[in-house]
From Swiss-Prot:
Family according to the record: Belongs to the GTP cyclohydrolase I family.
Gene Ontology BP terms: one-carbon metabolic process; tetrahydrobiopterin biosynthetic process; tetrahydrofolate biosynthetic process
Molecular function terms, GO-annotated: GTP binding; GTP cyclohydrolase I activity; zinc ion binding
Residues at which Zn(2+) binds: C111, H114, C182
One Gene Ontology CC term in the entry: cytoplasm
Protein name, as recorded: GTP cyclohydrolase 1
Record has Electron transport as a keyword: no
Keywords: GTP-binding, Hydrolase, Metal-binding, Nucleotide-binding, One-carbon metabolism, Zinc
PROSITE patterns per record: GTP_CYCLOHYDROL_1_1, GTP_CYCLOHYDROL_1_2
Catalysed conversion reaction: GTP + H2O = 7,8-dihydroneopterin 3'-triphosphate + formate + H(+)
EC number(s) from the headed UniProt entry: 3.5.4.16
């Protein structure tokens, strides 16, 4: 991982140490993204042919390539740590010691069990210690970890650990409220249920007042 940013390496190592990294095998050989897309295109062609779809139809002929490009460049791009957002933490010169909360962070992820959509919003809060982070960077970290096959519980914890690692403080809290299309569009076909997951660290876990302040922000968001 020598070509990766220091921040990407630190976050990846922290997740591995806690058993919270997305299950990924070591590649048999390194391949570039264009080769990856070409191989996925071939496999998607086979899948569509097995479904008796006519790939000579002008509506379908480019679908295998579109899916491959979508997988590599978009919805699974968070598997590639070379795409980890550029993060600059700033010295906390103003000595901010109150909660900083970002609400209504939109996220779209993919259920790793059925490869269908997870659609939701996140609320993220932290109490600065020695460093603060640009607010948009929190959104980018949420989006990075959402862009991979996921389960919501792990996604919530990955965001927490990433921010704790980058900010040098355990005082981080994350809550996600999302609709799972593996529930909405198949199986039970429940169109109205949503799933909420919360991960708390530091004062958010040990202090009832701090925890309640965060949960009030989450309820306001909902």
């Amino acid at each position: 991982m020598s070509s990766l940013s220091k921040e990407a390496v630190l976050v990846h190592e922290a997740l591995v140490a806690r058993g919270l990294e997305t299950p990924m095998r070591a590649p048999v050989q390194e391949i570039d993204n264009e080769t990856r897309k070409r191989l996925i295109t071939g496999h998607m062609t086979e899948i569509m042919q097995l479904l008796n779809l006519d790939l000579s139809d002008d509506s379908l002929m480019e679908t295998p390539h579109r899916i491959a490009k979508m997988y590599v460049d978009e919805i699974f791009s968070g598997l590639d740590y070379s795409r980890f957002p550029k993060i600059t933490v700033i010295e906390n010169k103003m000595k901010v010691d109150e909660m900083v909360t970002v609400r209504d962070i939109t996220l779209t992820s993919t259920c790793e069990h059925h490869f269908v959509t997870i659609d939701g919003k996140a609320t993220v809060a932290y109490i600065p210690k020695d460093a603060v982070i640009g607010l948009s960077k929190i959104n980018r970290i949420v989006q990075f970890f959402a862009q991979r096959p996921q389960v919501q519980e792990r996604l919530t914890q990955q965001i927490l650990i990433a921010l704790q690692t980058l900010l040098g403080t355990s005082n981080v809290a994350v809550s996600i409220d999302a609709v799972h299309y593996c529930v909405k569009a198949r199986g039970i076909r429940d169109a109205t249920s949503a799933t909420t997951t919360t991960s708390l660290g530091g004062l958010f876990k040990s202090s009832q007042n701090t925890r309640q302040e965060f949960l009030r922000a989450v309820r306001h968001h909902n």
